[in-house]
Curated annotation (Swiss-Prot):
InterPro entries: Ribosomal_uL22 (IPR001063), Ribosomal_uL22_bac/chlpt-type (IPR005727), Ribosomal_uL22_bac/org-type (IPR047867), Ribosomal_uL22_CS (IPR018260), Ribosomal_uL22_sf (IPR036394). PANTHER family: CHLOROPLAST 50S RIBOSOMAL PROTEIN L22-RELATED (PTHR13501), LARGE RIBOSOMAL SUBUNIT PROTEIN UL22M (PTHR13501:SF8). Keywords: Ribonucleoprotein, Ribosomal protein, RNA-binding, rRNA-binding. One of its GO terms (biological process) is translation. CDD domains: Ribosomal_L22. This is Large ribosomal subunit protein uL22. SUPFAM superfamilies: Ribosomal protein L22 (SSF54843). It comes from Synechocystis sp. (strain ATCC 27184 / PCC 6803 / Kazusa). This protein binds specifically to 23S rRNA; its binding is stimulated by other ribosomal proteins, e.g. L4, L17, and L20. It is important during the early stages of 50S assembly. It makes multiple contacts with different domains of the 23S rRNA in the assembled 50S subunit and ribosome. The keyword Thylakoid does not apply. Part of the 50S ribosomal subunit. The gene is rplV.
Length: 121
């Protein structure tokens, strides 16, 4: 396990992403604890729709680290990655005899944090 400098942790959040948090977590579990380069490769080649917003948030977190903290992207590791449930959009599907069934369209908030790996002495 790589030691991380959590004092220099930088994060990015995507809110109200129109996707189920369960499906996003399946992708986030694959990149948690990996280096930035590894995470990019994994996200590029995974066949899930959830990879697009996760990739966007990861790139944003690394850009924040580079611009705001002056950190090198090559040294960064995904220290935290989680998806919380957002509000569900409620829609109705007409059914027979004047009834209507509710359809829930879930949203989620994706958070990705990156931190520099500490050099081994």
């Amino acid at each position: 396990m790589t030691k991380l400098d959590t004092t220099a942790e930088v994060k990015a959040i995507a809110r109200y992403v129109r996707m189920s948090p369960l499906k996003v977590r399946r992708v986030l579990d694959q990149i948690r604890g990996r280096s930035y380069r590894e995470a990019l490769i994994i996200l590029e080649f995974m066949p899930y729709k959830a990879c697009e917003p996760v990739l966007k948030v990861l790139r944003s977190a690394v850009a924040n680290a580079e611009h705001n903290e002056g950190l090198e992207p090559a040294d960064l590791v995904v220290s935290q990655a989680f998806a919380d449930g957002g509000p569900s959009l409620r829609r109705f599907r007409p059914r027979a005899q004047g009834r209507a069934y509710q359809i829930r369209k879930p949203t989620c908030h994706i958070t990705v944090a990156v931190a520099p790996a500490l050099a081994d002495n």
